[in-house]
């Protein structure tokens, strides 16, 4: 099984390499940037991609480089980790069938799980793409990130204000954040997957 590690921090890449090198069934490659990873994916064709996208969480606009990277990932299982205390979950949160997100402090637990995976193990991929959010939750989240008030979101979606509030609460519970600011930070990355 091929694993691509992407992190600007040399020590993190070296640590992940050292941890996973004990498994003879894994082939590892590491690169410091998303730009280099986009090129490496074409030749290396990884089964799993472990990537630190913290810097991209700070970029609110559209990032063509990140969009290109995400498109190049194909059917690889992608684990995005962030140098933040959130999401508040000890296990990776699945955003889609192939993409999960976690806080960097839980990276050792992920690596422990990956080191036990044999080369014969196939990564499960569903024939139909799924999402963590319902279509209506996704619409509410998009409007919410533009700072639209509840009553306007409700009017646009033809639902009640309390339903909008309920969707917002479900969104923060699903992504394991406490408030809109934490969600907005993560949203700058996962908006490319929907």
What is the predicted role of each segment?
Residues 123-163:
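Helix-turn-helix DNA-binding segment
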Residues 173-194:
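Basic, Lys/Arg-enriched C-terminal extension of HTH/homeodomain DNA-binding domains
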Residues 138-142, 172, 184:
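Hydrophobic residues on short alpha-helical segments
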Residues 167-170:
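Residues within the DNA-recognition helix of helix-turn-helix
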Residues 1-123:
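N-terminal regulatory/sensing modules of transcriptional regulators
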């Amino acid at each position: 099984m091929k694993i691509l590690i992407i992190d600007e921090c040399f020590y993190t890449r070296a640590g992940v390499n050292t941890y996973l090198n004990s498994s003879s069934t894994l082939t590892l490659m590491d690169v410091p940037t998303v730009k280099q990873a986009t090129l490496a994916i074409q030749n290396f064709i990884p089964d799993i991609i472990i990537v630190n996208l913290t810097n991209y969480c700070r970029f609110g606009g559209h990032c063509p480089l990140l969009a290109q990277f995400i498109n190049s990932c194909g059917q690889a299982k992608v684990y995005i980790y962030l140098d933040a205390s959130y999401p508040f979950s000890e296990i990776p949160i699945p955003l889609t069938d192939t993409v999960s997100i976690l806080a960097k402090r839980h990276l050792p637990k992920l690596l422990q799980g990956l080191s036990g995976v044999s080369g014969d193990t196939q990564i499960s991929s569903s024939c139909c793409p799924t999402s963590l959010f319902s279509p209506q939750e996704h619409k509410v989240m998009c409007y919410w990130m533009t700072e639209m008030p509840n009553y306007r979101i409700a009017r646009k979606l033809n639902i009640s204000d309390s339903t909008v509030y309920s969707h917002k609460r479900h969104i923060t519970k699903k992504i394991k954040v406490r408030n809109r600011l934490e969600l907005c930070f993560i949203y700058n990355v996962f908006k490319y997957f929907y």
